[in-house]
Amino acid sequence: GYTFGNGDITGLRQHIGIVSSFITERLPQHMTAEKIVLTGKYKSSILYKAYGDKELQEAKDMLTSLGAGDLIGRKYRGLSQGEKQICLIARSLMEDPDIIILDEATVGLDLFAREKLLRQIDRITSLPHAPLVLYVTHPAEEITEKMDHILLLRQGKIVAQGPKNDIITPEVLADFYQNPVQIIPIDDHRFYINPLL
């Protein structure tokens, strides 16, 4: 284990993959999707190290494994927001991390791209030796079946945490939102939180 604040954070970086708009803004838009994915192998936004056909093939294979083989050869700047997010997820998986942090991963996506991305995230969590996925979001309807623990934060402080079924209750959510809410099922595993005004 690692205690936050103790030790060298450089070594810790090798165990964490991050998907964030902060990273998107720093990636070279002229590179192809597979080269963007390859930057994850080096934890860099540019390919400053020499790489060979083997490494590039790994990046292509990663895209293909996420059902995004059609992005190979396409320039990053020409991809839709959803396609860019898939590239970032593939990029975050390049070094087989222990943890993936997905920070507001669906911001800017249309309804269909959002659902496709959420399915990809569930697919990743189902893989053998899957990394722990830390999914940061505001819309509760993005919480999928595979997301089994919830941490509710308000102004940087923990309000509630625990198994999803213990946290997603009208009482806990009313305390969190400081207003009454109604939980409306979308399907067997997803829900929408409606504010009762």
Task: Go through each PLM region and give its residues.
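Conserved ABC ATPase signature
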Residues: 75-79
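Catalytic Walker B motif of ABC-type/P-loop ATPase nucleotide-binding domains
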Residues: 100-104
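H-loop/switch region of ABC-family ATPase nucleotide-binding domains
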Residues: 137-138
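Conserved ABC ATPase "signature" region
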Residues: 38, 53-71
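ABC ATPase NBD Q-loop/coupling interface
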Residues: 1-11
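ABC ATPase nucleotide-binding domains
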Residues: 176-197
